[in-house]
Every structure is written in C-alpha cells, then in structure tokens.
Swiss-Prot record:
Gene3D superfamilies: 1.20.5.170. A motif (HCFC1-binding-motif (HBM)) lies at residues 87-90. The chain crosses the membrane at residues 262-282. The gene is Creb3. It comes from the Eukaryota. GO terms for biological process: chemotaxis; establishment of viral latency; induction of positive chemotaxis; positive regulation of deacetylase activity; positive regulation of defense response to virus by host; positive regulation of monocyte chemotaxis; positive regulation of transcription by RNA polymerase II; regulation of apoptotic process. Residues 305-327 are annotated as: Disordered. PANTHER family: AGAP001464-PB, CYCLIC AMP-RESPONSIVE ELEMENT-BINDING PROTEIN 3. This is Cyclic AMP-responsive element-binding protein 3. Glycans are attached at residues 342, 380. It is a single-pass type II membrane protein. Residues 283-404 are lumenal. Keywords: Activator, Chemotaxis, Cytoplasm, DNA-binding, Endoplasmic reticulum, Glycoprotein, Golgi apparatus, Membrane, Nucleus, Repressor, Signal-anchor, Transcription, Transcription regulation, Transmembrane, Transmembrane helix, Unfolded protein response.
C-alpha cells in the first residue's frame, strides 16, 4: 500500500470524503488505485455495518435516477451565479455501497454538503423536489435569494407613466419600497393617466354623438324644406279652388236669374198658345156638335158712329116698317132679319128640308138697309134652286149694345 493510502486511512471519514471530492475535482491527482479505494471503504465501515443488509440493485438505480433526473427548476438554474460550466460525473461502485442505520445522521449531513455544492453549480439534472422526497434538505444560495428579491422589489412603470414623470420633471426609484411622497406621486400620475383615458373616451363618445346629431339635423332640415314646399303648393291649390268656387257661385246666381226670366217667357208663351188654341178647339167642337139641319151664317159688322146717338132709331125703324110689308115678306120667299152690330150669327131652321146640292147664294146687295147701328139682312131664296122650307119662316131680330 502506498503512503497516500495510509494517509487516507489515518484521516477522519468526513475528511476522507472531502479529500476524495477534491482529488476528483483536481483531475484525480493523488488518486488511489481501485484496490486501495476498496480497502479504505472497508475500513470506513464499522464491524456492525457488515451485518446490515446491502441495498439491492434496483434501489441503487432508483437513487441514481432521482439524483440525475432532468426536471430541474429553470428559475434556480437561471438565477444561479456560479461560474462553473462543466458537468460533474459521479460514479459510485454499486457493490461497495452500504448504509448503516446508526450512521444516518452522518450520511444526511454529508449529503447536505454535497447537494449544497451541487445546487450552486449549473448541473442541469438537479431536482430539489426529488432530493427533498428522498429525505435531503436543499438550501438555496444567497445569490438566488437576492435575485428573486430584486425582481420582486423592482418598480415597473409604463411608457405613459414614464413620459408623464419626465414631463413633470419627477423621478422615481426603480426599486421598492417607496416612500410616502413617492407613493403619492405615483398615485397622482396614475390618476392623471386614468383621467386622461376617461377624457379621451368621453370626447370620443361626444364626437360620435355630435356626428349623429348633425346627421339628424341635416335629415330633419331636408324634411322641413320638403314640407314647406308642400305647404306652399297646397296654399296655391287652395287659392285656385277658392277662385273656382267664387266663379261657380257667380255662375249659379246668373243661372238662377236667367232661369226666372226664361220661365217667365215660357209661361207667357204657353198662355198665349192656350189663348190661341182654346178658341179654335172650342169652335171646332161647336161646329162638330151642330146638327145638319142648322145652317150657320157668320158675319161681323162694325158700327161706324157712336152708339149713344143712334140708340132710339131701331125702334123708330121698326115702327116705320109696315106690318103689311112684314107679312108680305113673310108670305113671300124673302126673309128679313134685323141684327144688332154686336151679333153676327143667324140660324135658319129647316128641319124637313132636303139638303141642296150646293149652297144658295145670298143676295145682300139689293135688300140691305143700313140704319146707324142696326143692320137689316134679307135673304132671297129663289124657287128655281129647288130648296124651299115646308114650314112657315120666322123673323129673328137681335139687338144689342156695342161695347167698344
């Protein structure tokens, strides 16, 4: 056995572990050979350790896998300030690993020191949770605690807050905690930013509302113009209708006046036609009602002088006429009629006489006697004409007053 191995056996077990770790880090200088290491391990264990049941292979593999698991916390790795960039490869001979129950405290203390050194390195497979599950206690480095505290105590300001602070000429520290004055300044700045945003929102809403109002005003203005034009057209139509109504009223009044005058004219015409037609109809009816044995002689005579001067003359004329001449005229075929000037009809009755072939001619020129208002008519019927009455003739004298 070489003197290096004797020195290792003379050292304390904790010092031997530390020395072995240093030798491995320094490139295995003064490293003992494998048999020496085995001998030293055997010497480290007490006689009672030989009686302890050795760990099985799968338990050792489980322990190694837990130590070499890749689930390492990124925060711990990122915040590590260690400058060691190489990995540590630890190889433990499985056949020489044995744990005594009486030395659990020593192993835990030694493992704590080893894990403390490993945690400070950039070992990518270190998992603190797995170590804690296995019974190891992991303590973070002071540098990591400082980095986490610095990140948590750092004051984060937005761009608007920075601009407003620069505009007001104020400065705030980048670390926490802040003083009361600084907190008031920060609150005031943030309140201004909130008010600014609220004002912007209100202005935006107001602008939208004003735009809507302007559009509505334009719309209602156009409608108002259309309604005004419509009202003007309706007023013009109303005036034209009023003019037409006045014209119609004037026409109705004129038509009413014309109707009254026309009706009057029509009534006058109807009355005149009645006056003209009724006598003609009456005369035709009277002529149709006269029997065949009556002969009508119509003659209208007018008296030239006045009636008052010649009123007593008819009686004188009648008295002057001799009875003999009257009887003589009655006995003869001559018939004398004394007729007043107001009467013009003389009826001659011949009930049993035969109707002549033609009307006899009246000879009035030789036998007519005019005496003022009285007219003496004489009718001569010659026997040669063949129409003679079978009865005695009668003398009819009509007298009347002339009403001029």
């Amino acid at each position: 056995m070489d003197p290096g191995g004797q020195d290792l056996l003379a050292l304390d077990p904790g010092d031997q572990d530390l020395l072995g770790f240093l030798l491995e880090e320094s490139g295995d200088l003064w490293a003992a050979t494998e048999p020496d290491v085995k001998a030293s391990l055997d010497l480290e264990l007490s006689p009672s350790e030989n009686s302890v049941q050795e760990l099985s292979d799968w338990e050792v593999e489980d322990l190694l896998s837990s130590l070499l698991s890749p689930s390492v916390s990124r925060d711990v790795l990122g915040s590590s300030s260690s400058s060691i960039l190489h990995d540590h490869n630890y190889s433990l001979p499985q056949e020489h690993v044995s744990i005594d129950l009486g030395e659990c405290e020593m192993i835990s203390c030694r493992g704590r020191r080893e894990l403390t050194g490993l945690a400070g390195s950039t070992f990518p497979f270190a998992d603190t949770e797995s170590f804690e599950k296995e019974g190891f206690h992991v303590t973070p480095l002071p540098g990591e605690e400082r980095a986490a505290e610095q990140e948590m105590s750092r004051l984060i300001l937005t761009e608007e807050e920075k601009k407003l602070l620069e505009k007001e000429g104020l400065t705030l520290p980048s670390t926490l905690p802040l003083t009361k004055v600084e907190e008031q300044v920060l609150k005031r700045v943030r309140r201004k930013i909130r008010n600014k945003r609220a004002a912007q929102e209100s202005r935006k809403k107001k602008k939208v509302y004003v735009v809507g109002l302007e559009s509505r005003v334009l719309k209602y203005t156009a409608q108002n113009r259309e309604l005004q034009n419509k009202v003007q057209r309706l007023e013009e139509q109303n005036l034209s209708l009023l003019d037409q109504l006045r014209k119609l009223q004037a026409m109705v009044i004129e038509i009413a006046n014309k109707t009254s005058s026309g009706s009057t004219c029509v009534l006058v015409l109807v009355f005149s036609f009645c006056l003209l037609l009724v006598p003609a109809m009456y005369s035709s009816d009277a002529r149709g009602s006269v029997p065949a044995e009556y002969v009508v002689l119509h003659r209208k005579l007018r008296a030239l002088p006045s009636e008052d001067d010649h009123q007593p003359k008819p009686s004188a004329l009648s008295s002057e006429l001799p009875m003999d001449s009257t009887h003589q005229s009655l006995d003869s075929s001559e018939h004398m009629f004394l007729v007043s000037s107001n009467f013009s009809c003389v009826l001659y009755h011949a009930p049993q006489a035969e109707q002549p072939l033609h009307w006899p001619l009246w000879d009035l020129s030789s036998e007519m006697l005019f005496s003022d208002s009285n007219l003496l008519l004489q009718a001569n019927l010659s026997e040669s004409e063949g129409w003679q009455p079978n009865h005695s003739p009668s003398l009819v004298i009509f007298q009347g007053r002339y009403s001029g």
